[in-house]
Amino acid sequence: MWFMYKLMIIIPADIEDPMLNARWPDFLRAAESMPGLLREANARVVTSLFGDQQINMVHELFFETLIVLQEAMQSPDGLIAGQIIQELTQGQMTLLVAEHREDDIDNLRNYQQND
């Protein structure tokens, strides 16, 4: 299992794709230049199965530590990325910082065999 921190950007469904598509490359250019970025993930929501919040997309930026994540957000590229995502969503996105733990199925099965 491994552990890191991620910045989660949740974009609501009422933000139109044409608006996102117009400046999304600019956002990615800035976000992907943030110091300490280890990896990135993007998920377009296909179907909402339950809940009140309708979501268009979840974009995640992964960092080794919380301090590195915070420093990246305050970096020049982080500030530019933040400004662009604010403009793209008219401030309607949700930003979360989360601890991310991940494991692969083979390791999980090892625990099941020991039960």
Model-derived features: where do they sit?
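Short S/T/G/P-rich N-terminal loop/turn motif that feeds into the first structured element of a domain
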Residues: 1-57, 62-74, 98-115
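C-terminal structural segments of small proteins and small subunits
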Residues: 72, 77-97
